[in-house]
């Protein structure tokens, strides 16, 4: 099993997509790197902690390759906008891949270099990960009728899985 971390705006959106990918066995929303120990969501929302909202993705490489996960990641968010995804703005919403081994780093760099657009996605070695509060875990599945889910996450799911 391998682990990687994707930051592509609000972690609820990223989590909802990857939950539906065969070979992904566990997801945990949380916060990567930054300068505050064990931050809360309220801390992150200030935009001053240096953390990114991320989803920790645990996957079986024999069922889904890291390259496939990278392709999905780049399809489900805009990697050309700095510190913003839609109306979510701030460094906590930046596009980043927090890799856990040299092969992930190499594949991520290769993929970015092959893209024609100017990509702002950061490719950073994971330093530290803090799980988000429980109410952030499995958010879309537990709150699919909430307005944010209906307006942003559901259309993203429909677009990705019905193309």
UniProtKB/Swiss-Prot annotation:
Pfam families: PMSR. Keywords: Oxidoreductase. GO terms for molecular function: L-methionine:thioredoxin-disulfide S-oxidoreductase activity; peptide-methionine (S)-S-oxide reductase activity. The active site is at 10. Gene3D superfamilies: Peptide methionine sulphoxide reductase MsrA. SUPFAM superfamilies: Peptide methionine sulfoxide reductase. Its EC number is 1.8.4.11. It catalyses: L-methionyl-[protein] + [thioredoxin]-disulfide + H2O = L-methionyl-(S)-S-oxide-[protein] + [thioredoxin]-dithiol; [thioredoxin]-disulfide + L-methionine + H2O = L-methionine (S)-S-oxide + [thioredoxin]-dithiol. Transmembrane segments: none annotated. InterPro entries: Met_Sox_Rdtase_MsrA_dom (IPR002569), Met_Sox_Rdtase_MsrA_sf (IPR036509). Has an important function as a repair enzyme for proteins that have been inactivated by oxidation. Catalyzes the reversible oxidation-reduction of methionine sulfoxide in proteins to methionine. This is Peptide methionine sulfoxide reductase MsrA. The lineage of its organism: Bacteria, Pseudomonadati, Pseudomonadota, Gammaproteobacteria, Candidatus Pseudothioglobaceae.
């Amino acid at each position: 099993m391998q682990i990687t971390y994707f930051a592509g705006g609000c972690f609820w959106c990223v989590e909802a997509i990857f939950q539906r990918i065969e070979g992904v066995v566990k997801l945990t929303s949380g916060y990567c790197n930054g300068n505050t120990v064990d931050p809360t969501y309220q801390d992150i929302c200030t935009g001053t902690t240096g953390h990114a909202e991320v989803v920790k993705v645990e996957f079986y490489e024999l069922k889904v390759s890291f390259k496939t996960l990278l392709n999905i990641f780049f399809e489900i968010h805009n990697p050309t906008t700095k510190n913003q995804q839609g109306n979510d703005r701030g460094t906590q919403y930046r596009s980043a891949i927090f890799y856990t081994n040299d092969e992930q780093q190499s594949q991520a760099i290769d993929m970015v270099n092959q893209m024609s657009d100017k990509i702002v996605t950061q490719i950073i070695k994971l330093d530290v990960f803090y799980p988000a509060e429980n109410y952030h875990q499995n958010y879309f599945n537990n709150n699919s009728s909430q307005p944010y889910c209906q307006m942003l996450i559901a259309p993203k799911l429909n677009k990705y899985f019905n193309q």
